[in-house]
Amino acid sequence: MVSKMDIRSLQYFNQVAESGNITRAAKQLHVSQPALSRQIQEMEKELGVQLLVRGHHRIQLTQAGQYLYNRGNEIISLMNHTIQNVSEKDEINGVLEIGAGESIALLPVMTVINQIIDQYPETSVNIVSGDEQLIKQKLDNGALDFGIIMGNDNLIDYQSLTIPDDNIWGVLVTKDDPLAKLRVITIKDLINRKILISDQAYHQDKLRQWAGNDLNKLTFSGRFNLINNAKLLVETGNCVALTYKGLVESSKTVFRPLSPILKDHNYLIWNNNHQLSNVGKLFVEKLKNQFQTNITRKF
């Protein structure tokens, strides 16, 4: 079945979802409450699913409604972004949509973003945190202009820039943990410990290359997407976390690097098949200059 649902219908539905109340959403949309209710009912009839559970004071999204809300946001954002890119001439304006993993090596990227939004008041930035899989998915469907990923050298489907500084792998432990007394952590030190690791790293070969056959002796007790949440579990003293240097600060924990040293590169990537906006082109140009300046200063 091909739906006749349009962008306005998605905008109306998403406003209802965010407001949690049809009457409130109607006021914000400047339409009547009965008209908005009919719009939602027509969407449900057309799609053949229930989107909302209507309570006395607040509506709740069904599973189908939550899916439509999430994808609707992406579609609306992509539409606005497309209109902006098509209508611009030589002006530098609009939103830079950037997806990024966690790394302190991103400081030069943030410096360039700050320069652009400071120099061009009509620009802004939307930074989405996520792992490589999410970032590539959003790049491919046009929801992001750029992605910043770590540790993956297979970039054949994307344009890319290598960000100069690397990420240093190590272990986050509590200050009273025996491992905190060590200067570096070897694979032998991690045997018989409960280890937390990022979901992305768990599915890559980098750690296996470092640990060799001893990787099978390690106990991975949990996975995470954001280290700040995993840090709370580390602070209980029951687990340690494999992570990058410098991502978390805590009065209860310390970071110890792995030995032999293990590093990941950082890459800025963008889609081969999508034309960049003016602000996107400026972003790449400024980054190239910034990276070249940093490299020159190191010699």
Write out the residue ranges for each language-model feature.
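Central regulatory/effector-binding core of bacterial HTH transcription factors
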Residues: 93-155, 215, 223-226
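Short helix-boundary/capping micro-motifs
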Residues: 14-32
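Beta-alpha-beta core module
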Residues: 156-162, 166-168, 225-275
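Short beta-strand-centered segments that line the small-molecule binding cleft or hinge
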Residues: 2-4, 70, 111-115, 132-169, ...
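Secondary-structure junction motif
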Residues: 193-215, 276-284, 294, 298-299
